[in-house]
Regions:
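Sequence signature of WD/YWTD-type beta-propeller architectures
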Residues: 2-128
């Protein structure tokens, strides 16, 4: 395109997307964290038996995927998230995938530690 004797090029940049999945240990369920654009995360439930996906909730913030765990049967997700805004700033929570609504919530306040893992369906170990 030419504008007033100058060559002008439009540069289109596609945002990068990162995917991270956690598989349930005793069922055909997984959760997929779709991160991007920027500070947005989408939670997706994946039925690996029939390869179907259920879109869930978006979070404007950050989920630290490597500090998350799925219950052995895939019914519950333990996650560590942050938006670094008051009042919580960061927190660990348990939800039912593909949603992030907290069934249990532990405020953290910073980015050190956080999250945890399932020892069984009804027992967790927090990293607070």
């Amino acid at each position: 395109m030419t504008h007033a004797g100058h060559n002008t090029f439009m540069k289109t940049t596609l945002g990068s997307v990162r995917l991270y999945a956690i598989l349930a240990r005793k069922s055909a369920v997984a959760v997929v964290f779709r991160r991007g654009p920027s500070r947005n995360v989408l939670l997706i439930k994946w039925n690996t038996a029939d390869d179907t996906f259920e879109l869930g909730q978006w979070l404007r913030g950050r989920i630290y995927e490597r500090r998350c765990d799925l219950s052995p049967d895939g019914d519950l997700l333990l996650y560590f998230a942050a938006n670094y805004r008051a009042p919580l700033r960061s927190w660990s929570a348990i939800s039912r995938p593909p949603f992030l609504k907290a069934l249990a919530l532990w405020p953290k306040g910073d980015g050190w530690g956080g999250g945890g893992h399932f020892q069984s369906h009804s027992r967790i170990a927090l990293s607070h």
